[in-house]
Amino acid sequence: MSTSITVRNRDRSLPPLLLPNVSLLEKDIRRKGTQNVGITDPELLSTTWTRKRAFPTDELLGGYKRLKPAAADSNECAIGIATVTPPPTLPVSAIVPPPQNYTPPLFEYHPHALASMVNEDANASCTQMSIISRSTSNSTTSSATSTSSISKRQRSGPSCDKCRLKKIKCNAKIEILLQDDTIMPMISNKLRYVLTPDDIRLYRGTLLRNIAIPDDVIEGTGSRKLIKHIDKLVLLTPCLPCIKKKHSSSSTNFPKNDKCTFSKGFTRADINISSKISLKFKDKTIYDITYDDYKSIDF
């Protein structure tokens, strides 16, 4: 256990803040004895202590440690080993007070508010991402649903009689070239009439003047037909099953030359009219109904 040793400088010939060099004191003790030395403490006068407690010059110069100041004596003031000069301070008169109207700025730091703002930004971004992902999934689901519904549905309009009977998809193409009530009594008295090449040449300068009709229809060499149905002229392209004759010819209610037939009409309005006609004229088909029969029905 180390003990502190109080060192007092009683040699008045030395400067007040300097201590005697211990190594020099040891040489003087060997040469002259214990006289003429400014150390009066018996412990310091012993040669054994100086040998044991003497510090090398390198240690004194390199790793210098400040000793504790000696305690105050009853008769004289203790002289400290070292004193620290405090930094100069401004006089009281040099401090200028702030003006009366001066208001210091307030800088308030609210960690909870900052955390809440960060949380709100994170929640907003998460909400936006969830909305985007939800809208994307909804659009994907709706597109998939619409695609599946379109693929499952046979066609946008009615199917031909044979495809409806076989419950297969009908790819017949229906083009309405002209629709007007004035054409109902024209060309033929029948509500359903298939125009021949002679009929097309006859009405090409009047009724069919502004209608583009394909050459194969005019010449009668193709499978497409120009049909008058109630108040419209329809260009019908037969479906592929009817063209390939994959259906059986068990049905004898329709003419043999009309392979792809639409007995109930080509539009949904035609189906409504056909259902009313069939209720009143049960023994007639759409090919037998005349314009007079049509006028006798109250639509």
Curated annotation (Swiss-Prot):
<comment type="subunit">
    <text>Interacts with SSN6/CYC8.</text>
</comment>
<dbReference type="GO" id="GO:0005634">
    <property type="term" value="C:nucleus"/>
</dbReference>
<dbReference type="GO" id="GO:1900237">
    <property type="term" value="P:positive regulation of induction of conjugation with cellular fusion"/>
</dbReference>
<comment type="function">
    <text>Transcription factor involved in the induction of hypoxic gene transcription when the cells are shifted from aerobiosis to anaerobiosis. Promotes exogenous sterol uptake and stimulates endogenous sterol biosynthesis. With SUT2, positively regulates mating by repressing the expression of the mating inhibitors NCE102, PRR2 and RHO5 in response to pheromone. Finally, regulates filamentation via the repression of genes such as GAT2, HAP4, MGA1, MSN4, NCE102, PRR2, RHO3, and RHO5, when nutrients are plentifu.</text>
</comment>
<dbReference type="GO" id="GO:0000981">
    <property type="term" value="F:DNA-binding transcription factor activity, RNA polymerase II-specific"/>
</dbReference>
<dbReference type="GO" id="GO:0008270">
    <property type="term" value="F:zinc ion binding"/>
</dbReference>
<dbReference type="GO" id="GO:0045944">
    <property type="term" value="P:positive regulation of transcription by RNA polymerase II"/>
</dbReference>
<dbReference type="GO" id="GO:1900429">
    <property type="term" value="P:negative regulation of filamentous growth of a population of unicellular organisms"/>
</dbReference>
<keyword id="KW-0804">Transcription</keyword>
<dbReference type="GO" id="GO:2000911">
    <property type="term" value="P:positive regulation of sterol import"/>
</dbReference>
<keyword id="KW-0539">Nucleus</keyword>
<dbReference type="InterPro" id="IPR001138">
    <property type="entry name" value="Zn2Cys6_DnaBD"/>
</dbReference>
<comment type="similarity">
    <text>Belongs to the SUT1 family.</text>
</comment>
<dbReference type="GO" id="GO:0000122">
    <property type="term" value="P:negative regulation of transcription by RNA polymerase II"/>
</dbReference>
<dbReference type="GO" id="GO:0009267">
    <property type="term" value="P:cellular response to starvation"/>
</dbReference>
<feature type="region of interest" description="Disordered">
    <location>
        <begin position="133"/>
        <end position="160"/>
    </location>
</feature>
<keyword id="KW-0963">Cytoplasm</keyword>
<dbReference type="InterPro" id="IPR036864">
    <property type="entry name" value="Zn2-C6_fun-type_DNA-bd_sf"/>
</dbReference>
<keyword id="KW-0805">Transcription regulation</keyword>
<protein>
    <recommendedName>
        <fullName>Sterol uptake protein 1</fullName>
    </recommendedName>
</protein>
<feature type="compositionally biased region" description="Low complexity">
    <location>
        <begin position="133"/>
        <end position="151"/>
    </location>
</feature>
<dbReference type="GO" id="GO:0061629">
    <property type="term" value="F:RNA polymerase II-specific DNA-binding transcription factor binding"/>
</dbReference>
<dbReference type="GO" id="GO:0005737">
    <property type="term" value="C:cytoplasm"/>
</dbReference>
